From Swiss-Prot:
Organism taxonomic ancestry: Viruses, Riboviria, Orthornavirae, Negarnaviricota, Haploviricotina
Gene assigned in the entry: HN
Species name: Newcastle disease virus (strain Kansas) (NDV)
Important for interaction with fusion/F protein: annotated segments: 124-152
UniProt free text on domains: The C-terminus (head domain) is involved in binding the cellular receptor.
GO MF: exo-alpha-sialidase activity; host cell surface receptor binding
Side of membrane Virion surface, spans: 46-571
EC assignment: 3.2.1.18
Record protein name field: Hemagglutinin-neuraminidase
Length: 577
């Protein structure tokens, strides 16, 4: 029995000893494994130069820097993609469209001529040099961000003078009119042999030409056809327009002074003429007794016309017959435009009374002086289908000289500041069914004209007067949505006298640095401006045709002043009045 127990106890002791050694072996193996792993990790860390915990603090910063580098690289690539997209999707199609437009204009012009060949309308439609394709009649500067007055005119550039000057001391050249289409330009002025105040006889110079560039890249206006209309007709206040058939011109024919004309009972004779590409001039008198039956005096606006939708559009103005239907419909209508940051101190009722009286100045016998727009169908038959639009005086000021302009798809009417409002005005104009509609104007507070008191350059209140001078602005700078931002023009920088012609770029309140013709005592009168671009060089130029005093040969010499439009960081010069 005891032996059996001893045998069992011995077996238990042996089993426990085996278990103990197994445990020791397992622990030893586990420790060895841990040591080996630790050694391996340490070796790996050492070999890779890994950071210690204290180094890990800078990891987020390094990650941010790496992210910035990646973002910058992606942004740079995006700029390249954007430029490629702009070139492929925007600029190239636009250039092709401009080329197509010019070609279509030339084809249209040729089509008109072919259709009128039997009527001897002329052949050989001219066209500007290719450098100007897409740079005429377009929105030349499209810029949403830059200060308008950071654009400014260069010094006047020497170029070929395409305008004849007086050749005697008593000669007078006055009243320039200019218009340029995508294919050619038209120019006209009045010539009086015995001083600028003679109303009994004058002749009219009319020319057609194109823009050229010389071998050295200089611009010149090349006259291809011209004529001097020296006959028994006394054409006055002529406006010219470049159309597909040549140079269309609207003139009044007068034999009396302006005051006498307004005191007469019948409308003023008017004629629609054309200088064709063959150099021949033809003319037709309009039926003014029907077209202007409510008028006692009627004149073209002097400024250029515009070819729109198969018709030529001219600004006209004059006096209405008292109590005629056209006069009655305007009774009580008026508009008051205000100066920028310079409010009229007069009582509102008094301002309204003076504004109403401004349409009937005493100089013209109390007649209502009205603004209007005349459109004529362009065909081989002159004077065809004339339509007169008389805008309401709730939009326009007293009737005055003016100009119709087309830039891009926008049309404008410039109205001379003959009444109390001195800053330049450009009315947006829409056309439909042969008639025009004018809208509230853009005003350019620093682009003023001199005038007699109480309608001088700094005037701010409605008054009755006939004063000022013709100095039109040309739409130059636009927003991308085609809204007008700024204009170019040559103003007479004087309070009352016609002195000190100066060119500048203007926004609604101020002007750029200026380029003066000469000293502040230089006498001048009418100016008309047109801008265009040399697409090859992407340079924008503006032409101001200005009447400048000429003491040796005639009272005035008409000079084409050419500037390039430059850009800097902006030099603003506000008019203080």
């Amino acid at each position: 029995m005891d032996r059996a127990v001893s045998q069992v106890a011995l077996e238990n002791d042996e089993r426990e000893a085996k278990n103990t050694w197994r445990l020791i072996f397992r622990i030893a193996i586990l420790l060895l494994t841990v040591v080996t792993l630790a050694t391996s990790v340490a070796s790996l860390v050492y070999s890779m130069g890994a950071s210690t915990p204290s180094d890990l603090v800078g990891i987020p910063t390094r990650i941010s820097r790496a992210e910035e580098k990646i973002t910058s690289a992606l942004g740079s690539n995006q700029d390249v993609v954007d430029r490629i997209y702009k070139q492929v999707a925007l600029e190239s199609p636009l250039a092709l469209l401009n080329t197509e437009t010019t070609i279509m204009n030339a084809i249209t012009s040729l089509s008109y001529q072919i259709n009128g060949a039997a009527n001897n309308s002329g052949w050989g439609a001219p066209i500007h040099d290719p450098d100007f394709i897409g740079g005429i009649g377009k929105e030349l500067i499209v810029d949403n961000a830059s200060d308008v007055t950071s654009f400014y005119p260069s010094a006047f550039q020497e170029h070929l003078n395409f305008i004849p000057a007086p050749t005697t001391g008593s000669g007078c050249t006055r009243i320039p009119s200019f218009d340029m289409s995508a294919t050619h330009y038209c120019y006209t002025h009045n010539v009086i042999l015995s001083g600028c105040r003679d109303h009994s006889h004058s002749h009219q110079y009319l020319a057609l030409g194109v823009l050229r560039t010389t071998a050295t890249g200089r611009i010149f206006f090349s006259t291809l056809r011209s004529i001097s209309l020296d006959d028994t007709q006394n054409r006055k206040s002529c406006s010219v327009s470049a159309t597909p058939l040549g140079c269309d011109m609207l003139c009044s024919k007068v034999t009396e002074t302006e005051e006498e004309d307004y005191n007469s009972a019948v409308p003023t004779l008017m004629a629609h003429g054309r200088l064709g590409f063959d150099g021949q001039y033809h003319e037709k008198d309009l039926d003014v007794t029907t077209l202007f039956e409510d008028w006692v005096a009627n004149y073209p606006g002097v400024g250029g016309g515009s070819f729109i939708d198969g018709r030529v559009w001219f600004s006209v103005y004059g006096g209405l017959k008292p109590n005629s239907p056209s006069d009655t419909v305007q009774e009580g209508k008026y508009v008051i435009y205000k100066r920028y940051n310079d409010t009229c101190p007069d009582e509102q009722d008094y301002q309204i009374r003076m504004a109403k009286s401004s349409y009937k100045p005493g100089r013209f016998g109390g007649k209502r002086i009205q603004q209007a727009i005349l459109s004529i169908k362009v065909s081989t038959s002159l004077g065809e289908d004339p339509v007169l639009t008389v805008p309401p005086n709730t939009v326009t000021l007293m009737g005055a000289e003016g100009r119709i302009l087309t830039v891009g798809t926008s049309h404008f009417l410039y109205q001379r500041g003959s009444s109390y409002f001195s800053p330049a005005l450009l009315y947006p104009m829409t056309v439909s069914n042969k008639t025009a509609t004018l809208h509230s104007p853009y005003t350019f507070n620093a682009f003023t004209r001199p005038g007699s008191i109480p309608c001088q350059a700094s005037a701010r209140c409605p008054n009755s007067c006939v004063t000022g001078v013709y100095t039109d602005p040309y739409p130059l700078i636009f927003y991308r949505n085609h809204t007008l931002r700024g204009v170019f023009g040559t103003m007479l920088d004087s309070e009352q006298a016609r002195l000190n012609p100066a060119s500048a770029v203007f926004d609604s309140t101020s002007r750029s640095r200026i380029t003066r013709v000469s000293s502040s005592s230089t006498k001048a009168a009418y100016t008309t401006s047109t801008c265009f671009k040399v697409v090859k060089t992407n340079k924008t130029y503006c032409l101001s045709i200005a009447e400048i005093s000429n003491t040796l040969f005639g009272e005035f010499r008409i000079v084409p002043l050419l500037v390039e439009i430059l850009k800097n960081d902006g030099v603003r010069e506000a008019r203080s009045g």
